[in-house]
């Protein structure tokens, strides 16, 4: 909005302590900020701050509370267009892992990934993404938990599984391929032939919560011998702000959508807290990541914000921040 005011402008109710949560249908309900417990003046101040730091750069911000839109800003961009979620997609990967474990397709987060996707070990020296990156014997013990928590050390000689927090893409690709393979949806010999992990997400989450997002595979430019079918083909979701809000609302409600437990609640509780691997092996300032989510329970990511807050974040300033 050009005046940087919240979408809704007429104050109604100041006390929102008894406001009930609702779920969107085809679209979201909108409400006055005060009705949802927001201070209109502070929202306006936040909008002006965003405008000042953005300058001429486009941006979109959507604020939801109790299942209703409280404020929205769109500057030089179409609010209905889709944006690549980049690494913010990893939080959705985590959600599907939790579902796959509940369904018994993956027996445990602590299972060895190579038991489901042995191809991950078939990357010799000279076949990885660059010099020094290849699958080595210790990678055979990597677990699903280590992959989603970015502590796997996959194709990182010298990094023992579960010991080093190293934010990476290729380990996440192994995660999605292993899960999709367990559902018989991915083949390294022809990655684009199978339905893929993105379609699995549509079946297990998107269609159940009324989302509209699409997905695509992405690859970095690599040398000719790189085994992209094994460790490439990243699943990336293309979402509108309202799609992002649906995912955030699902996560904030511990995986529940209007009474349907889409993602196991116990998985969401676990995934949105800093992992034990990071707590045990990294210094306090790196106590920032759970199982596919940026987590604040150790007050390291956002020291001045509530400890129960967490986020999906990706390149291009793609963020879904939730505060239960």
Regions found by a protein language model. Name each.
Residues 67, 83-109, 175-179, 244-247, ...:
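Active-site SXXK
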Residues 78-80, 157-161, 172-173, 180, ...:
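Flexible glycine/proline-enriched surface loops and loop-helix/loop-strand junctions
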Residues 216-278:
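Flexible, glycine-rich surface segments
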């Amino acid at each position: 909005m050009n005046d940087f005011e919240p979408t809704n402008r007429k104050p109604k109710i100041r006390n929102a302590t008894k406001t009930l949560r609702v779920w969107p249908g085809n679209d979201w309900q909108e409400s006055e900020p005060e009705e949802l417990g927001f201070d209109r003046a502070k929202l306006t101040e936040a909008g002006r701050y965003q405008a000042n730091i953005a300058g001429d750069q486009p941006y979109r911000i959507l604020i939801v509370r109790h299942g209703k839109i409280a404020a929205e800003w769109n500057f030089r961009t179409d609010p209905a267009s889709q944006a690549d979620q980049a690494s913010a997609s990893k939080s959705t990967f985590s959600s599907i892992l939790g579902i796959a474990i509940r369904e018994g397709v993956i027996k445990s987060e602590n299972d060895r990934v190579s038991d489901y996707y042995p191809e991950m070990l078939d990357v010799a020296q000279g076949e990885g993404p660059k010099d020094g990156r290849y699958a080595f014997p210790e990678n055979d013990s990597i677990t699903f938990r280590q992959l989603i928590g970015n502590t796997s050390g996959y194709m990182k000689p010298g990094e023992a599984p579960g010991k080093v927090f190293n934010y990476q893409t290729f380990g996440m690709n192994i995660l999605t391929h292993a899960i999709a393979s367990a559902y018989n949806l991915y083949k390294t010999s022809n990655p684009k032939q199978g339905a893929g992990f993105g379609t699995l997400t549509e079946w297990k989450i998107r269609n159940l919560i009324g989302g509209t997002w699409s997905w695509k595979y992405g690859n970095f430019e690599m040398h000719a011998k790189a085994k992209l079918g094994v460790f490439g083909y990243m699943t990336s979701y293309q979402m509108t702000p309202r799609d992002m809000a649906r995912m955030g609302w699902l996560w904030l409600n511990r995986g529940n959508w209007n009474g349907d437990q889409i993602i196991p609640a116990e998985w969401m509780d676990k995934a949105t807290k800093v992992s034990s691997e990071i707590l045990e092996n990294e210094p306090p300032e790196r106590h920032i990541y759970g199982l596919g989510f940026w987590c604040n329970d150790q007050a390291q990511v956002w020291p001045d914000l509530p400890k129960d807050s967490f986020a999906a974040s990706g390149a291009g300033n793609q963020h879904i921040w939730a505060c239960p």
